[in-house]
Amino acid sequence: MSEKETPSPVLDVKKEKNEETGIDEEKSSEDDCSKRSKVKSNPSKFSVNSILSPLESLVRVQQQLLKMAASKSGTPGTNAGVPGAFPYGPGRLPGNYFAGPFPGYSGAQPNWYNGNDPRFAAAAALLPCSIDPVRSAINHQFSMSSMSQRRKRRVLFSQAQVYELERRFKQAKYLTAPEREQLANSIRLTPTQVKIWFQNHRYKCKRQEKEKAMSGLGHSEDGSSPPPDNDDDDDKYSIEMDDKDDEEEEESEKPVLKPSGVFGLPYPPNAAAAAAAAAAAFNFPFAAQGPNPAYYMRW
């Protein structure tokens, strides 16, 4: 009897193992539950709820203010029927929402279509001008006013001014800044107007030369001459330019140094003449001698 009552050590080890595994399983299930609760309690920062949560709090504050204003104004509650069946009843809205035929719909519409919801105001502030009609209209009006201010106007020259300008143009087609200022003061014009007249007149002369060349070819082939181009009226007008346009014209008239093909550096003026004079002064002997045919016959 004593031998049967003694428990076997193998069974005790199994029980301990089973008990240990059971405890481990319970612990693992508790850990899983805690992890899931942590995941639920810590949502992603980039989720829709986390982004809209501050805006929703503002909406709640605004709704409370609206309710307080409605209670102070003394609007009676006329929401008949089951309470809470329709949240947008006339009893829960301010007095200015009762103008429409359907009070509930008129109250819901401004809340969803750019009404008192601050989310729509924040989104409208971030919209570009092409989407926001108010901002686009303001910018369009501002751009039109700036364009009207920069619109160039034509200045009519007198016959005496045109005569003096043509006489000076025959002497020199290009004027320096002091000469231009002196001529402008003598005929009561601005230096910019004188400069523009000279530019227009140079362009007119070049165009007339091209037309004469083309008309000469056409007259020799067909025997008929094209109608003459009367550009005398162009000299009577000048377009007044702004200071910015004047600076651009001065920069365009400056000589441009083209880079060389060796080191990419620009050639100085009169570089070719200086190089030829230096070569002639040294008089290299190998440059004057021609090729020797005997040198090539050896090969």
From Swiss-Prot:
Ranges annotated as biased composition (Acidic residues): 242-252
UniProtKB keywords: Developmental protein, DNA-binding, Homeobox, Neurogenesis, Nucleus, Transcription, Transcription regulation
Nucleus listed as a keyword: yes
Pfam families reported for this sequence: Homeodomain
Tissue: Expressed in the 8 vulval muscles, 8-10 ventral neurons in the head and in the most posterior pharyngeal muscle cell, m8. Expressed in SIA, SIB and SMB sublateral motor neurons, and in muscles of the pharynx and vulva.
Compartmental location: Nucleus
Listed PANTHER family: HOMEOBOX PROTEIN NKX, MUSCLE-SPECIFIC HOMEOBOX PROTEIN TINMAN-RELATED
Family from the record: Belongs to the NK-2 homeobox family.
Designated name of the protein: Homeobox protein ceh-24
